[in-house]
Amino acid sequence: RDLRMSRGLGDVYKRQDGTTHQMGELYTILATQNPVEQEGTYKLPEAQLDRFLMKITMGYPSLEEEVDILERHHANASLVKLESLTPVLTKEELLSLRRLMEHVFVDRTLLQYIALIVQQTRTSKAVYLGASPRASVAMMQASKAYALLQGRDFVTPEDIKFVAPYVLQHRLILTAEAEMEGYSPVKVTQRLIDKVEVPK
């Protein structure tokens, strides 16, 4: 199967047997990323990375979690059967939440706050390539979704500060000097956020 991302993740087409199909409105792409140093692993182009809403780093499992993984593999039960999974949301409920998110209020001062954070990535000496306007849109959407999950119909500066590292870290390319000094995209993002005055 050949997946092609066109204009955004909302416009993903699947090409199979020479036929192109537009995917449904709830079609979502989740991708894993291996270290670039691993054989056969290559960096995605910036334009493709920019189409992913967020990057979430899972980290290593705890001792208990790793023992659980070993037990499941030992019992040959490592694969979860789809029929044993219980849905937590129906398609209709998910679409309803999406419609609710559209009505989450974002004050103009917070739109400026988002834009200022993203613009900082373009002027920072630690950043070789900053975030595009698509990152601003992603940060606004992620902030609205997070506010909704917190039971609110409005976005706060704290929502923006919470989602910003996840939205920006895969979109920033650091300078060689910054990398040699031990900076990571998350660390740089946090410093840039701290530079921007929080709206009152």
Please annotate each region the language model reported:
Residues 84-136:
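Conserved AAA+ ATPase small/helical "lid" subdomain
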Residues 1-13:
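Single conserved hydrophobic/aromatic residue that forms the stacking wall/gate
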Residues 60-72, 84, 102-106, 176-200:
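Non-catalytic accessory segments flanking P-loop/AAA+ NTPase cores
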